[in-house]
Regions:
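Short, positively charged loop/turn segments that connect secondary-structure elements
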Residues: 35-50
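Short, cationic-aromatic polyanion-contact patches
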Residues: 66-91
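A short, conserved structural fragment
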Residues: 59-65
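Short acidic, hydrophobic short linear motifs in intrinsically disordered regions
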Residues: 23-34
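Long, charged, low-complexity intrinsically disordered regions
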Residues: 2-5, 89-91
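Metal-cofactor-dependent catalytic cores
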Residues: 12, 27, 86, 90
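Positively charged, polyanion-binding regions of nucleic-acid-associated proteins
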Residues: 3-24
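Basic amphipathic alpha-helical segments that dock to polyanions
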Residues: 54-58
């Protein structure tokens, strides 16, 4: 299964649109929405984080750990959450 960055981004935006403005999602929510097989969704996690980093740089999403907003270069390890950024536009 080949899942590209555009597909990951669309899924991420859809999941964030379905939540209230102050809510967050886990990157694994995105991966699991794209692939139900654990081996496959786990393999998608680096790509999901890469897309999240790109969208964070553009201000579309915020990457957080607890209540702290992280810069994209701080997400190579550890738990993170994704929230709507100031440039987020709901569908």
């Amino acid at each position: 299964m080949n899942i590209d960055d555009t597909t990951i981004e669309r899924c991420m935006m859809k999941l964030l649109s379905e939540r209230s403005a102050g809510s967050s999602i886990c990157p694994s929510d995105v991966a699991r929405a794209l692939a139900s097989d654990e081996t496959v969704w786990r393999a998608l996690m680096p790509a999901v984080r890469k897309v999240a980093a790109r969208l964070a740089e553009a201000g579309v999403v915020r990457i957080t750990r607890g209540e702290t907003t992280l810069s994209p270069d701080e997400i190579d390890h550890g738990p993170i959450r994704l929230r709507r950024g100031p440039g987020f536009v709901a569908d």
